[in-house]
């Protein structure tokens, strides 16, 4: 038991990342039923589709689950309203200023964690009053911060900059990686790609097979001129 498991009411300090196109109700409920924290990825869902996934997830598990919400999305007001209406108790926010919604969510009894790519942003999260911070290094899939700080450099930097409960993310997919993150000061981990390749994930079977066939040196960057987006992970073969 630590601050992360106590905060979210979970057995293990493992959070399944809320990935677009991958993290629907089947994956989130499976992770929650296994003792972790499953997250629905709202970023790829129409607001009413999100409502449907929340209801199906609640029917599939009686354990805590949450929703990951990128704050930059144009339908953010409608998404937040649905989250509140459906009684979601945990929200992970990213891609925006946590001050914009943290107070509103807290007023409705919702726990808030925010994803950051630097210790500077972690301090802003503490000022905004979030309940936990996710330190996401450049190894993470999806859209990352422009700092390009690697996960195991970022963890101690954020740990030294804030007193918030700390979740590490980015390139973590094995027990050894979880242990290393904890040694550096994390109290929990957020894992994405590893869960994206499970049967419960809604990712394309072709994508899953592709990732499972990768080896050392196969990590690739796509669309970097638009946004830092590393894909394809070598640690999955460990």
Regions found by a protein language model. Name each.
Residues 173-175, 195-197, 227-229:
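Short, catalytically relevant binding-site loops at active-site mouths
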Residues 168-172:
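Glycine-rich adenosine-cofactor-binding loop
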Residues 234-238:
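Conserved small/polar residues in nucleotide/adenosyl-binding loops
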Residues 1-161, 165:
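Active-site entrance/lid segments in N-terminal catalytic domains of soluble metabolic enzymes
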Residues 154-156, 160-162, 182-184, 191-221:
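Conserved catalytic cores of soluble enzyme domains
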Residues 120-128, 173-187:
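Catalytic cores of alpha/beta
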């Amino acid at each position: 038991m630590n601050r992360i498991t106590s905060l979210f009411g979970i057995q293990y300090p493992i959070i399944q990342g809320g990935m677009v196109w991958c993290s629907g109700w089947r994956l989130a409920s499976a992770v929650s039923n296994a003792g972790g924290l499953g997250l629905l990825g709202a970023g790829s869902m129409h607001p009413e589709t999100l409502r449907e996934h929340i209801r199906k997830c609640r029917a599939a598990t009686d354990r805590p689950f949450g929703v990951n919400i990128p704050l930059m999305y144009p339908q953010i007001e409608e998404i937040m309203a649905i989250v509140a209406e459906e009684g979601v108790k945990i929200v992970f926010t990213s891609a925006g200023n946590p001050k914009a919604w943290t107070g509103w969510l807290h007023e409705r009894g919702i726990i808030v964690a925010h994803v950051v790519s630097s210790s500077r942003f972690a301090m802003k999260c503490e000022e905004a009053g979030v309940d936990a911070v996710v330190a996401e290094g450049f190894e993470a899939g999806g859209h990352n911060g422009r700092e390009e700080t690697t996960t195991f450099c970022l963890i101690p930097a954020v740990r030294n900059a804030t007193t918030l409960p700390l979740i590490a993310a980015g390139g973590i997919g094995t027990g050894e990686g979880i242990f290393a993150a904890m040694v550096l000061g994390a109290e929990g981990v957020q894992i994405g790609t590893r869960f994206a390749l499970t049967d419960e994930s809604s990712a394309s079977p072709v994508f899953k097979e592709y990732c499972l066939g990768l080896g050392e040196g196969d990590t690739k960057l796509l669309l970097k001129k638009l946004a830092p987006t590393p894909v394809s992970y070598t640690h999955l073969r460990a």
